[in-house]
UniProtKB/Swiss-Prot annotation:
Occurrences of domain EGF-like (ranges): 612-645
Phosphoserine PTM positions: 745
Proregion residues excised on maturation: 17-173
Signal peptide positions on this chain: 1-16
Residue ranges occupied by any Disintegrin domain in the UniProt entry: 383-472
Organism of derivation: Oryctolagus cuniculus
PTM field: The signal and the metalloprotease domain are cleaved during the epididymal maturation of the spermatozoa.
Protein name: Disintegrin and metalloproteinase domain-containing protein 2
Residues on Extracellular side: 17-702
Record GO cellular component, one term: plasma membrane
Length: 751
């Protein structure tokens, strides 16, 4: 296997503060021109600001990346983790552009004035409120490298890509993707950022906002699922190079981040001088064992540069390689995956090579974690209010007012303190009954449909376990269709849900004839800038949904047009909504519908399925269970997890995830000593891909071998002794030695 290592080296060129400076500092007063409000929150806002005597118009759209259950964690004096209960807003972060400048990007927060960056093609301006100003005055300044000739990287031959790439543009996928990230800030960076929890949190919010702007073209949102601050002491040693630190962090992550949901975790580390700026594993974004990274923050780089470092690490973890500047092109002066992007100002765009890499990544099953949709409604997080019937941070329960709590029988929650009453284990939840936890094994969430699974109370929590479903790609609907995200994707069933039980799925002739017409009413495969898109011959089962009318009744659906067409003696039905209607998606064959052998519909095209050759198969489950969405076996009754091989007649069925299993952890989750793919340490010009023999010299991969050397020496000695004893026994049976001297002489000779 080709093992690849990237090194970002030579950053000593950034040691001095003279390498960058703020120029043309001036005061401006932003003027709000208009805004669009939804449910009390500004979703769109327009500002005018003056820079060097010229007025610029900023068009901003709300960008939500803090989920409702977001938490900031710290540790108390005993080392126990605690919720720091920070007050913050998630609705005041915006992303947009400067009117009249197509290659521009604006990333600002409006929580307390305007704070953020205005990026033009080759220059970046920072804006922040002027402290103690009473007239909404802001400071605006240009950030520019003073000595751009400094080489930041080792002088070595560069070889970033082994495969040729097309130069033409490749459009990314249209559907949204989400990367849920847990960020850890180590002690020295916490001090460097201000030694204040609120200030550091806001800077991390700004960092994630800047990183989100980078991934706009991929329609990816970076969700900051939780933030952890190592205020007084680091939980692991942060010394050593990025490679060693990555292995150390992943080992810690495996033990301590299991209860905090995330797709990927990153440790941010401050260094006065750094030879490397980060490490991650290539293409391992959704692999629970390797979905992590380390980003080093050298003293003199800006938050904008740190965002590029983070974006490059995230890109590498999605299998997006560094650009070969001779083969890869982008509209901007510096592409994102060009290592020089870390030290250039202005807007940066992914190259055509990066877009192709990303398209390959999301077309595979291993990218599935990016499809989880978090809760992203606007909210304002403030101190917990006891008595509002909402359990908030710091509360064990909240049953409402004293009068409301008094109606409960029995009373589990103290209405004055929002703490559990003495003797109570819980106050509410699917697995709470009469103030105590329900016994393990009681069903708390029955399956909804044939692609869902049972969940059970675990006996130690009031909450039902997470909703786990059958693995994508499992056959359903009499083996004609497949499960996708817990639903059986069956066009015939969709026809029934829309038109009624008497309607059947459309005939092959309906799809073949009508979806080939490029007619908005009869059949299309989408709408483009050039008009209606005709379905190509291989995609006709993935365009407009076709159903078969079996009665003489006229169907009427509010706000929809029903189309009837006679094709080969069958009455074909299709549906037409306005494109912006809430139910417009019902017009189309759903993503995941089977359209051929090992093919499914995706974005109105019939493509090779990614739901085959998965890590979990029926054979892994001893043919006595099925695989769930976490690729663990959900075993039949009497057959026990994790692999459905052991038997217990009392077992009702389930998995290690369903709540009713009392066994240990899940075997087969490898540790760091079994790493099969080396980490990427993002590099800069002068860095090449190292082959396997070079990678094997890395410290984290050689220590297990040295631990085994004494074992092999001892084993060899034992084998030699046994062979010699057997040899001597044979001699004792055939020769009669009369003296020790003769014995020694014979022994030396025969040896």
């Amino acid at each position: 296997m080709l093992r690849v290592l990237f090194l970002l080296c030579g950053l000593s060129g950034l040691r001095t503060k003279e390498n960058s400076e703020r120029l043309h500092v001036q005061v401006t007063v932003p003027e709000k021109m208009r805004s669009v409000t939804s449910e009390g929150f500004e979703t769109e806002v327009v500002y005018n600001i003056v820079i060097e005597g010229k007025t610029y118009t900023l068009n901003l759209m709300q960008k939500l990346f803090l989920p409702r259950d977001f938490r900031v964690y710290g540790y108390d004096s005993t080392g126990i983790m605690k919720d720091l209960e920070q007050q913050f807003q998630n609705f005041c972060y915006y992303q947009g552009f400067v009117e009249g400048y197509p290659n521009s990007m604006v990333i600002v927060s409006t929580c307390t004035g305007l704070r953020g960056l205005l990026q033009f093609e080759n220059v970046t301006y920072g804006i922040e409120p002027l402290e103690s100003s009473i007239g909404f005055e802001h400071v605006i300044y240009q950030v520019k490298n003073k000595n751009e000739s400094i080489s930041l990287y080792a002088e070595k031959e560069v070889e970033f890509r082994d495969l040729p790439y097309k130069v033409q543009s490749v459009q990314p996928r249209e559907f949204s993707q989400y990367i849920e990230m847990h960020v850890v800030v180590e002690k020295n960076l916490y001090k460097h950022m201000g030694s204040d929890t609120a200030v550091v949190s806001q800077k991390i919010f700004q960092l994630i906002g800047l990183t989100n702007a980078v991934f706009t073209s991929f329609n990816i949102t970076i969700i900051l699922s939780s933030l952890e601050l190592w205020i007084d002491e680091n939980k692991i040693s942060t010394t050593g190079d990025a490679n060693e630190l990555l292995y150390r962090f992943l080992k810690w992550k495996k033990s301590y981040l299991v209860l905090r949901p995330h797709d990927v975790a990153f440790l941010l580390v401050y260094r006065e001088i750094a030879k490397y700026v980060g490490a991650t594993f290539q293409g391992k974004m959704c692999d629970i064992n390797y979905s992590g990274g380390v980003a080093l923050h050298p003293k003199t780089i800006s938050l904008e540069s740190l965002a590029i470092i983070l974006a490059q690490l995230l890109s590498l973890s999605m299998g997006i390689a560094y650009d070969d500047i001779n083969k890869c092109k982008c509209p901007g002066s510096v592409c994102i995956m060009n290592p020089e992007a870390i030290h250039s100002s202005g807007v940066k765009i992914f190259s055509n090579c990066s877009i192709e890499d990303f398209s390959r990544f999301i077309s595979k099953q291993k990218s599935q974690c990016l499809q989880n949709l978090p809760r992203l409604e606007p909210f304002y997080k403030q101190d917990a209010v006891c008595g509002n019937s909402i359990v908030e941070a710091g509360e064990m329960c909240d049953c409402g007012t004293a009068e409301e709590c008094g109606r409960a029988v029995p009373i589990c929650c103290n209405s004055a303190t929002c703490r559990l009453e003495v003797g109570s284990q819980c106050a509410e939840g699917e697995c709470c009954e009469n103030c105590t936890f329900k016994e393990r094994g009681q069903s708390c969430r029955p399956p909804v449909g044939e692609c869902d699974l049972f969940e059970y109370c675990n006996g130690t929590s009031a909450l039902c376990p997470d909703d786990i479903v059958i693995q994508n790609g499992h056959p359903c609907g009499e083996n004609q269709w497949i499960c996708v995200d817990g639903s059986c994707i069956s066009p015939p069933e969709q026809c029934k849900s829309i038109f009624g039980e008497e309607v059947e799925g459309g005939t092959p002739e309906c799809y073949e004839e009508l979806n080939a017409m490029a007619d908005i009413i009869l059949g299309i495969c989408g709408i483009t800038h050039d008009g209606y898109k005709k379905c190509e011959s291989g995609n006709r089962k993935c365009g407009k949904l076709m159903c078969k009318h079996t009665t003489e009744n006229i169907i009427d659906i509010k706000n929809a047009t029903i189309i009837y067409a006679n094709v080969s003696g069958s009455i074909c039905l299709s549906l037409e909504y306005k494109p912006d209607h809430l139910d417009a998606a019902k017009m189309w064959v759903p993503n995941g519908a089977v359209c051929g052998s090992n093919k499914i519909c995706r974005d109105k095209a019939c493509v090779e399925t990614t739901y085959v050759n998965l890590g979990c198969t029926l054979q892994n489950c001893n043919n006595q269970g099925i695989c769930n969405s976490l690729q663990h076996c959900h075993c039949n009754p009497t057959f026990l997890p994790p692999n459905c091989s052991a038997v217990d007649e009392r077992w009702a069925g389930g998995s290690v995830d369903s709540g009713n299993f009392q066994g240990g952890g899940v075997p087969g989750i490898g540790g760091l000593t079994s790493v099969g793919t080396p980490p990427f340490i993002p590099g800069v010009p002068g860095v090449r891909r190292y082959m396997e023999d070079v990678y094997q010299t890395a410290k984290p991969t050689r220590w297990p071998f040295f631990l085994l050397i004494p074992f092999f020496i001892i084993l060899g000695a034992l084998i030699a002794i046994l062979v010699k004893v057997q040899f001597q026994r044979k001699k004792w049976k055939t020769e009669d030695y009369t003296s020790d001297e003769q014995f020694e002489s014979d022994s030396e000779l025969k040896e």
